[in-house]
């Protein structure tokens, strides 16, 4: 039995979970999210208000999807109650970010500003010209947008310049030494 998959998912008050076959829809104070569970995995509501994720057999695919499915359902519930936020920072002379309406505009040492549009369900907040955050209810979307922004100018291992997650440690390399 999967150590993660066998733990029941608690549903807090104010969250409505509806299950229709393999489709799970979660509605909460911050919005609504839907997920389709892969075929061998079954999900059911318990009498005590929790959700249980079960697998029919011990095949390799079923074991692999058991814990994953439970975690994805838990992420939906956490997203509609608390939401997800990724804080990021920019290091480098002249590197900065500005909020233009709902979108972000980066100055990252290129000959042009780099705009990033806010997709549906994602909000940006700029705390200072070098610190900003990406927020939303979908954990996967928040993480993907954050990774795309970081990819605009990855942190340099020699000087540490670039876009990074808050608190991220960059492995620094020693430069060449002259003779």
Curated annotation (Swiss-Prot):
Main function: This protein binds to the 23S rRNA, and is important in its secondary structure. It is located near the subunit interface in the base of the L7/L12 stalk, and near the tRNA binding site of the peptidyltransferase center.
Alphabetical UniProt keywords: Ribonucleoprotein, Ribosomal protein, RNA-binding, rRNA-binding
Family (UniProt): Belongs to the universal ribosomal protein uL6 family.
One Pfam family, short name: Ribosomal_L6
UniProt KW Cell cycle keyword: no
GO molecular function: rRNA binding; structural constituent of ribosome
Subunit structure of this chain's protein: Part of the 50S ribosomal subunit.
PANTHER family: 60S/50S RIBOSOMAL PROTEIN L6/L9, LARGE RIBOSOMAL SUBUNIT PROTEIN UL6M
SUPFAM superfamilies hit by this protein: Ribosomal protein L6
Keyword check for RNA-binding: yes
GO process annotations (BP): cytoplasmic translation
Protein name according to UniProt: Large ribosomal subunit protein uL6
Transmembrane annotation, as ranges: none
GO CC terms, sorted: cytosolic large ribosomal subunit
């Amino acid at each position: 039995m999967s150590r993660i998959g066998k733990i029941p998912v608690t549903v807090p008050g104010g969250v409505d979970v509806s299950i229709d076959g393999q489709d799970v829809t979660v509605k909460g104070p911050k919005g609504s999210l839907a997920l389709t569970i892969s075929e061998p995995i079954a999900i059911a509501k318990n009498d005590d208000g929790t959700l249980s994720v079960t697998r029919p057999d011990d095949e390799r695919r079923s074991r692999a999807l058991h814990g994953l499915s439970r975690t994805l359902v838990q992420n939906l519930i956490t997203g509609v109650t608390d939401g997800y936020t990724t804080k990021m920072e920019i290091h480098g002379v002249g590197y900065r970010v500005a909020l233009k309406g709902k979108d972000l505009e980066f100055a990252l040492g290129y000959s042009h500003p780099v705009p990033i549009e806010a997709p549906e369900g994602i909000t940006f907040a700029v705390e200072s010209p070098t610190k900003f955050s990406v927020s939303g209810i979908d954990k996967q979307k928040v993480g993907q947008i954050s990774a795309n922004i970081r990819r605009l100018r990855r942190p340099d291992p020699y000087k540490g310049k670039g876009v990074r997650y808050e608190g991220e440690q960059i492995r620094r390399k020693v430069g060449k030494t002259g003779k």
